[in-house]
Amino acid sequence: MEFIAPCHFGLEAVLKKEILDLGYEVSSVEDGRVTFAGDENAICRANVFLRTAERVLVKVGSFHAETFEELFQGTRGIAWEDYVPEDGKFWVAKAASIKSRLFSPSDIQSIMKKAMVERLKTVYHKEWFAESGASFPVRVFLLKDEVVIGLDTTGESLHKRGYRKLTAKAPIAENLAAALIMLTPWHKDLSLIHISEPTR
């Protein structure tokens, strides 16, 4: 299986090291995300142990699209029945487009949802879906007309782990805070005071 781990821009190298430390093979590093290979256990392990990732997605497909028709056909060509059961609740939770001809997130989401419905109608021989079962949110990234689609396994964003137990005037996302610490020479045998006062 192939997975996508989005992260804050500039933290790709930190996330890559985390993934390698978990024992998984990184297949690509791009702006704001790292793609890696793993088995089904990687879904749980990545969601629990990756401190700098925003979420973990199962990569379900990728293709080139410059028009909404190409987006529709590419999305419909994905075997959604392998991921979404007949009663599954599915939607495109987020669409991000950078330097692509298709740039309207709401239009991208709408076209993709229609394509998913058309695919599942053909497979399940149904005209209407109650979507009363488990949730299957989908996320899509467009970069220079290259479309990458992932199925979200995380739910609430991973930056909300331990969310706001202690508040401050300028709170920082937990995954960003973890990345900042990982970029310092600190290790578990040192107190954090060594970061700001290295002479102590």
PLM feature spans:
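Hydrophobic, well-ordered secondary-structure segments
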Residues: 109, 113, 117, 137, ...
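Residue-level detector of conserved catalytic or cofactor/ligand-binding positions
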Residues: 190-199
